[in-house]
A protein has these predicted regions:
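Acidic-enriched catalytic cores of C-N bond-cleaving enzymes acting on peptides and small amides
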Residues: 1-6
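Short alpha-helix boundary/capping motifs
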Residues: 7, 58, 84-85
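His/Asp/Glu-rich mid-to-C-terminal helical/loop segments that flank catalytic regions of hydrolases
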Residues: 32, 70-113
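Preference for short coil/turn "hinge" residues that link or interrupt alpha-helices
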Residues: 11-13, 40, 75-76
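Short proline/glycine- and acidic-rich turn/helix-capping motifs at secondary-structure junctions
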Residues: 8-21
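Active-site-adjacent substrate-binding region
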Residues: 18-69
Length: 113
C-alpha cells in the first residue's frame, strides 16, 4: 500500500546471539573493573546489537567477547548521538574517566586468572 514500488525487500541471513559464560575471565574482569570504579553492573546472558559476536563466541572459535565501557552517551548512530566529554556529576563518567576505565580493564585482565 505504501512506500516505493521499485523497492523490494528480501529477508534472509541473520546470526546467532553472542553468549559468554559469566565464569569467563573476560566477564570476571569486566565485573572487577566496574566494582573498582564503584559502578553497578548488570549481566545479560545474551548480547543484542548490530555486530555478529557469535562469530567469535561460538564454535569453532569459542573465545569470549562482550561490550564494556564506562561513561555516558546515547543515540548511537543517530543524528542526536552524543557522548559526555566532561562530567560535573561524580557518579557519571566523562571521557577521561571512561578512558581510565579501559586502562584499568586491561590491567585487571592481565591480573585475573
Amino acid at each position: 500500500k505504501h512506500g516505493f514500488a521499485d523497492v523490494e525487500i528480501k529477508v534472509g541471513g541473520g546470526y546467532d546471539p553472542t553468549e559468554v559464560s559469566e565464569d569467563s575471565r573476560l566477564i570476571k574482569t569486566m565485573l572487577a573493573t566496574y566494582a573498582r570504579a564503584g559502578a553497578k553492573a548488570t549481566l545479560n546472558p545474551r548480547l543484542a546489537g548490530s555486530w555478529p559476536g557469535a562469530t567469535f563466541t561460538a564454535p569453532p572459535v569459542s573465545i569470549p567477547a562482550g561490550h564494556f565501557g564506562m561513561g555516558h552517551g546515547s543515540g548511537a548512530h543517530a543524528p542526536d548521538e552524543y557522548y559526555l566529554i566532561e562530567s560535573t556529576n561524580p557518579k557519571v563518567a566523562g571521557l577521561v574517566d571512561a578512558t581510565m576505565g579501559y586502562a584499568d580493564f586491561l590491567y585487571q585482565l592481565a591480573a585475573i586468572k
